[in-house]
């Protein structure tokens, strides 16, 4: 039982003091990084806005923000992504 309690304490301490993997390692840059892209287009009507990830991220990405404030990473080289960006810029 003591081993279990000690292990639980270590896990909780680690979880408390570690930052999520998507957080930026640079204090002045709060843009999240993407590590994978969505495999298919989102419904255009669900997207409210977009932004590009930082150049400090390992892969370039466009992050679409849905009406429910969900952030989805997309490949900026895909045709549907460029079309969605153009549509959002026009509106």
Curated annotation (Swiss-Prot):
GO cellular component labels: extracellular space
Molecular function terms, GO-annotated: CCR chemokine receptor binding; chemokine activity
Signal peptide as annotated in the record: 1-23
Record keyword Disulfide bond present: yes
Main location, first listed in the record: secreted
Stored PROSITE patterns: SMALL_CYTOKINES_CC
GO biological process: antimicrobial humoral immune response mediated by antimicrobial peptide; chemokine-mediated signaling pathway; eosinophil chemotaxis; G protein-coupled receptor signaling pathway; inflammatory response; positive regulation of cell migration; regulation of insulin secretion
InterPro entries listed in its UniProt record: Chemokine_b/g/d, Chemokine_CC_CS, Chemokine_IL8-like_dom, Interleukin_8-like_sf
Pfam families cross-referenced by the UniProt entry: IL8
Disulfide links within the chain: 33-57, 34-73
Name under which the protein is recorded: C-C motif chemokine 5
Organism classification: Eukaryota, Metazoa, Chordata, Craniata, Vertebrata
Name of encoding gene: CCL5
């Amino acid at each position: 039982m003591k081993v279990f309690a000690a292990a639980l304490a270590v896990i909780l301490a680690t979880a408390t003091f570690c930052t999520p993997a998507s957080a930026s390692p640079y204090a002045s840059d709060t843009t999240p990084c993407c590590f994978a892209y969505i495999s298919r287009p989102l419904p255009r009507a669900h997207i409210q806005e977009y932004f590009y990830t930082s150049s400090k991220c390992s892969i370039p990405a466009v992050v679409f923000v849905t009406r429910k404030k969900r952030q989805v990473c997309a490949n900026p080289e895909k045709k549907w992504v460029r079309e969605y960006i153009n549509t959002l810029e026009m509106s």
